[in-house]
Amino acid sequence: MSKKITSIRGMNDILPEQTGLWQWLEAKVGAVLASYGYQEIRMPIVEQTDLFKRSIGEVTDIVEKEMYTFDDRNGDSLTLRPEGTASCVRACEQHGLLYNQTQRLWYAGPMFRHERPQAGRYRQFHQIGVETFGMTGPDIDAEVILLTARLWKALGLEDKVVLELNSLGDSADRARYRDALVDYLKAHFDDLDGDSQKRLERSPLRVLDSKDTGTREVLKGAPQLADYLNDEAVAHFEGLKALLDASGIAYKVNPYLVRGLDYYGKTVFEWVTDALGAQGTVCAGGRYDGLVEQLGGKPTPAVGFAMGIERLILLIEQERPELSAPVDVYVMAMGDVLAPTMALSEHLRDALPGRAIQLHCGGGSFKSQMKKADRSGAAVGLIMGEDELASGVVTVKPLRGQGEQVQVAQGDVANAVTSFLE
């Protein structure tokens, strides 16, 4: 017997019993995004490798260790996208969407990183991303944060997440701070964990992200980035906080919050939870005013975020909402009545748009068909046999809760089904 082929480690199938929850989440998110006037954009999952080297940064863990990169038959280096922002910027610049105009965009789809698979962290994972372009003030920063807060309410997660904020200033601010931080950390080098010691020379701000207890203790005495911000960056951050205060959005200023992507500046934020263990960040974003120019376009202010769908699913499953069954009505034919039963099913799909009508196929006894009707999750079963056909009626049988089966005229079936489903 041939060896079975299975999915790649860290790249998971989403099975039929799971897709209902995914569709519910996607519909909720889509409705909120539409209410803010955001438009969907769809980008390819494969891009030129240079796109991510130039945007994310060549000395980041993502580019050095985690990207799925390969050469195609022409010898071009291509990469499965590890995140969506760079692709969105590339698409907007390529198609002239940023020329003298603002944009509010969103996208959803799979991303790829070669990481150690664990709960909430996979090699193929899915994100919903939001990107805005052409707006400089703290008002658009506040809008994208308000949008995420509304998403949590729509998903029933508002009590499970906390907002953390920081400002990274501009590149000159970060350079001054970097020098001060390096001097401090070198004086405490032996107290740092191994990963932080490696990061110190190449990407010292990433040390602020360390989860190591000893390193966290060292960082308590480290210089604060807030003391190195220019006046404009300070005013921007204060303006954002004032807008969030006025909107009733609670937040915590986290001086150690940095992002793992080199293009961020000024505002950065994360929504975190303590319900997922080590994978506590469910949404992260910030401002990246230099990225469009970095990728060959004109200077363009921008701010956005991405949220991990798998992590949201894990959160939602802890208090799983009552989702409707994938099938509302299960239709069964008993005897030589398949053609009229199929016609009845088509009639119901016309009469009850939005309802799922499933016709039993494959024949079988009454008992076996009823078992399959029950397993389908349908609320109502419809039975048509030769006697029903001759009498012009259909048997309507409730499959969930209370209620007696009844026979109704074929022309009244849609109304009868509706009454059982309400």
Curated annotation (Swiss-Prot):
Organism: Alcanivorax borkumensis (strain ATCC 700651 / DSM 11573 / NCIMB 13689 / SK2)
Coiled-coil regions listed in the entry: none
Keyword annotations from UniProtKB, A to Z: Aminoacyl-tRNA synthetase, ATP-binding, Cytoplasm, Ligase, Nucleotide-binding, Protein biosynthesis
Source species, domain of life: Bacteria
Any one cellular-component term (Gene Ontology): cytoplasm
Assembly behavior: Homodimer.
Annotated GO MF terms: ATP binding; histidine-tRNA ligase activity
Protein location: Cytoplasm
Gene3D superfamilies on file: Anticodon-binding domain (3.40.50.800), Bira Bifunctional Protein, Domain 2 (3.30.930.10)
PROSITE patterns named among the record's database cross-references: AA_TRNA_LIGASE_II
Cited InterPro entries: aa-tRNA-synth_II, aa-tRNA-synth_II/BPL/LPL, Anticodon-bd, Anticodon-bd_dom_sf, His-tRNA-ligase, HisRS-like_core, HisRS/HisZ, HisRS_anticodon
CDD domains the record matches: HisRS-like_core, HisRS_anticodon
Main subcellular localisation: cytoplasm
Keyword Protein biosynthesis: yes
Top EC category: ligase
Transmembrane stretches, start-end: none
Protein name according to UniProt: Histidine--tRNA ligase
